[in-house]
């Protein structure tokens, strides 16, 4: 157990868990989000992006910003929680973690509301000019969340603690709270409350979408595959929230209370759970691109064409290889072996 004038405990399994999970997420996330951004840049001229595509591009950028910090966290946990690079990079990594988490929540929220309007008020939504609104909302989200996260850049988020074997000191990153700090507790209560407010609004909008799609008269429905894609999109957004964001925010407040010393009975168990929810939280960078497949027709078509061309090229490659074999060795002939001396 770590004691440094606070109530901290340690979960040593994280020094193995985080490097593995973050390495996988980094590779998959950079490939997936980089590909998404390339597809958007290739298929959609910037002036033709509608509101929902603007939100999707911003969500991708937020994911990529966080992914760029993962190598720092991989090194940190590989060194058993010792921050060996510049202190400012600790502040920057924490800042981008906060920005990605709550930009993702915000953009998934406005994407859901956009789909809710399209289903609940289709005529009004079709007549609306939404590009300007998409740009405005995106700027508001970025500015408000970045301004809040700038606090992490202005303070020293590292602290020095002795090693367990007593052989020296190590530098922790974002692992120190002043005991019984009321301002920190208030901030965490506010953030957690805001998250669940947004989550319940998203849940309500998605339930309305599902109910409308399932109960709308057949004559008003489009092709069955369109309805099926819409339902899958709703389920995917809810899955991202339930898998990535909800567990972290359920554990966050009890964990904060334990870290501050208000409740220490189950501190170790809560801290263990907190490490797992941090891993789940980071998986949103990999799951977000899945949502795009259900939202844009061109994106799905592009993926289908690429997948089909890859399968065709493999078949052609195998066919060419077989043809070459038949040309080199016809079936009615046998190879001539060299004479032995």
Swiss-Prot record:
> Where is the major localization of this protein?
membrane
Q: Which residues cross the membrane?
A: 17-38, 55-74, 92-113, 134-155, 185-205, 234-254, 276-295
Single Gene Ontology MF annotation:
lipopolysaccharide immune receptor activity
> Which cysteines share a disulfide bond?
90-173
Membrane side Cytoplasmic: which residues?
39-54, 114-133, 206-233, 296-341
Instruction: Indicate how the chain sits in the lipid bilayer.
Output: Multi-pass membrane protein
Glycosylation sites (chain numbering): 4, 169
Q: Where is this chain's protein located in or outside the cell?
A: Cell membrane
Matching entries from SUPFAM superfamilies are given as: Family A G protein-coupled receptor-like (SSF81321)
Any one annotated GO CC term: plasma membrane
- Supply the alphabetized keyword list: Cell membrane, Chemotaxis, Disulfide bond, G-protein coupled receptor, Glycoprotein, Membrane, Receptor, Transducer, Transmembrane, Transmembrane helix
One Pfam family from the record: 7tm_1
Q: In which tissues is it expressed?
A: Present in almost all organs including spleen, small intestine, kidney, lung, liver and brain.
Residue intervals on the Extracellular side: 1-16, 75-91, 156-184, 255-275
Q: Which GO terms describe its biological process?
A: cellular response to 2-O-acetyl-1-O-hexadecyl-sn-glycero-3-phosphocholine; cellular response to cAMP; cellular response to fatty acid; cellular response to gravity; chemotaxis; G protein-coupled receptor signaling pathway; inflammatory response; inositol trisphosphate biosynthetic process
Quaternary state and interactors: Interacts with ARRB1.
Q: Which family does it belong to?
A: Belongs to the G-protein coupled receptor 1 family.
State what this protein does. Receptor for platelet activating factor, a chemotactic phospholipid mediator that possesses potent inflammatory, smooth-muscle contractile and hypotensive activity. Seems to mediate its action via a G protein that activates a phosphatidylinositol-calcium second messenger system.
Record protein name field: Platelet-activating factor receptor
